[in-house]
Amino acid sequence: MSILQVSTSSLSSSTLLSISPRKSLSSTKSCRIVRCSVEGTTVTERKVSATSEPLLLRAVKGEVVDRPPVWLMRQAGRYMKSYQTLCEKYPSFRDRSENADLVVEISLQPWKVFKPDGVILFSDILTPLSGMNIPFDIVKGKGPIIFNPPQSAADVAQVREFVPEESVPYVGEALRRLRNEVNNEAAVLGFVGAPFTLSSYVIEGGSSKNFTQIKRLAFSQPKVLHALLQKFTTSMITYIRYQADSGAQAVQIFDSWATELSPVDFEEFSLPYLKQIVEAVKQTHPNLPLILYASGSGGLLERLARTGVDVVSLDWTVDMAEGRDRLGRDIAVQGNVDPGVLFGSKEFITSRIHDTVKKAGRDKHILNLGHGIKVGTPEENVAHFFEVAQEIRY
């Protein structure tokens, strides 16, 4: 057995976790090793030069790394005082997310404080809708609202092909600037919504608790839904390529609502379109890591693996060790600490991080939450999460 050494400033002594070794690829990247003292404990920190690949990308490939890379979904958001202050000046979410200056500023807020290994674009999966002739808004306290949800083949025919250079040039500008700001000290991450999840928002007219409208369409007019799914698929292929060409070093695909489908319906209304996206993107960007997240995906893990993505992001309802076994060792995993854990004590947070890292094993793991950071999460607890994660050594 190999030993994982974890040293944290919150513990009086080092904590040892046993990790079963798994085969890794050798890294050819050169790094400078810096040793510093933290409250009497020597911490070895790997300083990556701006010319070498970020830790997150090397981990996804299965290269030998000192620790798991870490970033958190919704790491830029309402739990941060700096974000709250900015919201007072710019109360509209779309004003904040559709302005390159603000997108860069907000995306970098957690980077400047916590130094995560992934810096994700501040945006929304619904951002492309306006450019597809689907009017929408995001209202504080209500969430997304889709005006005039499509209900027929004629309505779907009015949905336009997405041209990101014309519709969302601020996304490209923000990604280019983020790459320059982060300077390869972390991976710049883009993201898109998956076709079924986007269709769900559009058909339901916003968020939903029971998904009656999308299922009514799926089971009574499947051809209409398939036409909409194909339009979103083609558009998201274009959008991922645009993000990659603008500076994104990995892209996460959110299929948040796919788990509302039964396995057989997932295979009809989600899986083929996810596979189509992955295959098309890999033809033009073969080295771009694609991450897939689907909330509550325990019943679909094997099917998620069939999409061809490089990383599957697990939520907290799946045991990390069991999830790895079910997905297979060729796929990297991300996650999967319960976001609610961040309301606990620092000792509790530390123990859950250690448990997750131990179960994930030594390679091909990105430490993250199983969902986004919750509103009201203490900012100091997020800081502690990053501190503990960054002091882990395999």
From Swiss-Prot:
PROSITE patterns in UniProt: UROD_1 (PS00906), UROD_2 (PS00907)
Subcellular locations according to the entry: Plastid, Chloroplast
Enzyme class: lyase
Domain of life: Eukaryota
A GO CC annotation given for this chain: chloroplast stroma
Purpose: Catalyzes the decarboxylation of four acetate groups of uroporphyrinogen-III to yield coproporphyrinogen-III.
Official protein name in the record: Uroporphyrinogen decarboxylase 2, chloroplastic
Organism: Arabidopsis thaliana
